């Protein structure tokens, strides 16, 4: 049975990442520092982490959303609802005006999921053509 709990240091290390996460790790010097830079959560299945996510709170009224998941996420629609509810609660608690996420465009499932969460294309990263920024205003 899946449960959601506050993120604990090292939870992400116990997840067998999907290809999209393995690619993202190549771009992040120290993921743990980023993962604890704001409210975050871990979804566990039978006590083992399968999804971690959170929002890095910025000083300009916005936040950077992140998600680190195993293939488990693709079999459980309830994760989308949990992530949406977490996101909306953080936006409300911190009175955020917008959220953004950097997306590897080679993974269409991620783009569809962001559409469901009402994020839209905002910009491309000049130095990394395969990455786009998607944003949602509140």
Predicted regions and their residues:
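A short helix-loop-beta-strand connector motif used in the catalytic cores of GNAT acetyltransferases and
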Residues: 32-42, 48-51, 95
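C-terminal "cap" of GNAT-fold acetyltransferases
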Residues: 127-138
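Conserved acyl-CoA
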Residues: 82-98
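Conserved beta-strand-loop-alpha-helix junction that forms the acyl-donor binding cleft
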Residues: 96-115, 125-128
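Short amphipathic alpha-helix that is part of the acyltransferase structural core
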Residues: 1-29
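Conserved glycine-rich acetyl-CoA-binding loop
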Residues: 71-85
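Conserved acetyl-CoA binding element of GNAT-fold acetyltransferases
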Residues: 60-74, 132
């Amino acid at each position: 049975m899946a449960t959601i709990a506050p993120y604990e240091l090292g939870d992400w290390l116990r997840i067998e990442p999907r290809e999209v996460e393995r690619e993202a790790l190549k771009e992040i010097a120290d993921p743990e520092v980023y993962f604890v830079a704001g409210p975050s959560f871990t979804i566990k299945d039978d006590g083992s982490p399968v999804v971690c996510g959170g929002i890095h709170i910025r000083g300009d009224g916005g936040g950077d959303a992140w998600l680190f998941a195993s293939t488990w996420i693709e079999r459980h629609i309830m994760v989308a609802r949990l992530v949406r509810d977490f996101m909306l609660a953080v936006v409300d608690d911190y009175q955020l005006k917008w959220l953004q996420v950097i997306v590897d465009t080679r993974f269409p499932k991620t783009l569809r999921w962001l559409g469901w969460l009402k994020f839209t294309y905002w910009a491309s990263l000049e130095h990394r053509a395969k990455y786009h920024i998607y944003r949602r205003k509140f």
